[in-house]
Amino acid sequence: MALRFPRFSQGLAQDPTTRRIWFGIATAHDFESHDDITEERLYQNIFASHFGQLAIIFLWTSGNLFHVAWQGNFESWVQDPLHVRPIAHAIWDPHFGQPAVEAFTRGGAPGPVNIAYSGVYQWWYTIGLRTNEDLYTGALFLLFLSAISLIGGWLHLQPKWKPSVSWFKNAESRLNHHLSGLFGVSSLAWTGHLVHVAIPASRGEYVRWNNFLDVLPHPQGLGPLFSGQWNLYAQNPDSSSHLFGTSQGAGTAILTLLGGFHPQTQSLWLTDMAHHHLAIAFIFLIAGHMYRTNFGIGHSIKDLLEAHTPPGGRLGRGHKGLYDTINNSLHFQLGLALACLGVITSLVAQHMYSLPAYAFIAQDFTTQAASYTHHQYIAGFIMTGAFAHGAIFFIRDYNPEQNEDNVLARMLDHKEAIISHLSWASLFLGFHTLGLYVHNDVMLAFGTPEKQILIEPIFAQWIQSAHGKTLYGFDVLLSSTSGPAFNAGRSIWLPGWLSAVNENSNSLFLTIGPGDFLVHHAIALGLHTTTLILVKGALDARGSKLMPDKKDFGYSFPCDGPGRGGTCDISAWDAFYLAVFWMLNTIGWVTFYWHWKHITLWQGNVSQFNESSTYLMGWLRDYLWLNSSQLINGYNPFGMNSLSVWAWMFLFGHLVWATGFMFLISWRGYWQGLIETLAWAHERTPLANLIRWRDKPVALSIVQARLVGLAHFSVGYIFTYAAFLIASTSGKFG
């Protein structure tokens, strides 16, 4: 008999129902559960798949470069970045009528095009690319890297080139390689690119391979490096009247500490960024030589962890046993990696707008909004994934004997205290924040707006003042001209920083008031509740009071049969599932806040946010309804415009989102009954009954239906907000 899907599980392959297909898809990437899997094959498969992942990433980025070079307007955008709309790619759509063709023909293009809101134009411009030829060269190079990655993946699946398990578990060598080889060397290489290509380009000098060795990045060459006069590299920086991309007002410095923003581009100084990357390269190149490998020198991570016993004796055995626990658990390692990456991604969202690194991106408002929202949603999914794999670690990989009385065991021992404190914080934040909002709504509805409870965020204002914002009148740290902190930086980075913090043309330390105070606490509620669900899911993954044997049922299970009460909906997977809803909800509030505050700043009517954000009706009416009115109006038989497709996507997103509820608010028995009825009718209908199926149709399992519902909810939610965000911002600012 021919092998049926899934080949990795003979048990499933012999299942006579459609469960075979869905369970096969669900467990396709759960390598640990496959037939004939060994630890060695598990590690080798994952390692090889990383090369495939890299190939896809390189191919995708190559495609971005290629399509902009082929169909974009990069060269004309470079001439006038503030007024030419960057084109992502052409649209070839047989459904477009004449009005659509006209609506989407923009940016100087001959036919319909999509505008780029990704920020790639600003990025490529900042790093020194200027022509379509540059873009094609980059696309070809990335295509080459993609091919190399595929070859690498194939190579490491061949018997001769398969690494051993001991190679994968050599943590010190891997850390040294990643710290020095990846972070250190790549940061150094990036510094080199900025100094040799990007900074000259910002001063009107075109450096390419043909003149790379002839153009000195600094008039004195390597002299100051070898003579120890490094400060010479910081002398004569670009002036405040410098026109980016030209020699007008340009200096000769390559590594500076100016602080603040380039006045014309409103982005960080390129010479500051080169300096920053050089410092990071230096730190990581040292860090990558700290761990003991072949030469018998340096730290052993295991020794470090074993030696760390907390003083006083009241915190148990500290980190004893952690080295082997982490090193032998891929889920633990993945959980740590995802947690770090999630935090970094959210920080990228925050810093891309507050400290823009790319020239002119701060004045491209739609791109700013899209970038912030994009990175926050990605951070949310990554962070929930971190806790999911933490829970799987506790179920599959945690060994109580190995971790007796260490930090992991103690987390489990006092999980009730952790969970109840998170619960208390969530309840406190929720009731008080909602109470304040609702009180304010009642006051406005009853005609006494002066009775609103409006709380000034004085602690946050004090922190902003400590960083140099003078508006609030606190005389503290950097906003105090007599203090040592102020005087220490006065001759280098401080003037640039202080002018950036105190001028209102950027998003650095925005002025905050009672509306910000309220939404800050609403977001804190969302974050604490999401964390509560995720932490409880992981800490209760092995067992809870109602179900002490939970770990025996695995990561995702619906119930322990109908006869055992209190076992439904409490698997670690269910916690992850619930947390994703809260995560989406929270990031909704975060992005609403960011977008509304910025729209009013960009339009110069910030009082609208300040006055309307203190009560719920204000958010619904003056943010959501006011900014979606064009989308709700949409398209009609008499015409359309370039927002019509966003209006269609806004509608479509709502439909996908609503479809999720069909799976979420229904029971399996209903679907099973429906399927039985349809199958019965099919088998008794002439002609139709000539078509048979090999697999008996059965309803999705409870867990699978939840996943399908969650997927539709998430995708619809994000599609809807993406359409709203891009249309409402580009409709106002282009």
Swiss-Prot record:
Record membrane topology: Multi-pass membrane protein
Binding site for chlorophyll a B1: H654
Molecular functions per Gene Ontology: 4 iron, 4 sulfur cluster binding; chlorophyll binding; electron transfer activity; magnesium ion binding; oxidoreductase activity
Record localization: Plastid, Chloroplast thylakoid membrane
Group of enzyme by EC: oxidoreductase
Cofactor note: P700 is a chlorophyll a/chlorophyll a' dimer, A0 is one or more chlorophyll a, A1 is one or both phylloquinones and FX is a shared 4Fe-4S iron-sulfur center.
Amino acids binding phylloquinone: W671
Keywords carried by this UniProt record: 4Fe-4S, Chlorophyll, Chloroplast, Chromophore, Electron transport, Iron, Iron-sulfur, Magnesium, Membrane, Metal-binding, Oxidoreductase, Photosynthesis, Photosystem I, Plastid, Thylakoid, Transmembrane, Transmembrane helix, Transport
Binding site for [4Fe-4S] cluster: C559, C568
Stretches that traverse the bilayer: 46-69, 135-158, 175-199, 273-291, 330-353, 369-395, 417-439, 517-535, 575-596, 643-665, 707-727
Pfam families noted in UniProt: PsaA_PsaB
CC per GO annotation: chloroplast thylakoid membrane; photosystem I
Role: PsaA and PsaB bind P700, the primary electron donor of photosystem I (PSI), as well as the electron acceptors A0, A1 and FX. PSI is a plastocyanin-ferredoxin oxidoreductase, converting photonic excitation into a charge separation, which transfers an electron from the donor P700 chlorophyll pair to the spectroscopically characterized acceptors A0, A1, FX, FA and FB in turn. Oxidized P700 is reduced on the lumenal side of the thylakoid membrane by plastocyanin.
PANTHER family documented for this protein: OUTER MEMBRANE PROTEIN, OMPA-RELATED, PHOTOSYSTEM I P700 CHLOROPHYLL A APOPROTEIN A1-RELATED
UniProt cross-references to NCBIfam families, sorted A to Z: psaB
Family: Belongs to the PsaA/PsaB family.
Protein name: Photosystem I P700 chlorophyll a apoprotein A2
Protein's gene: psaB
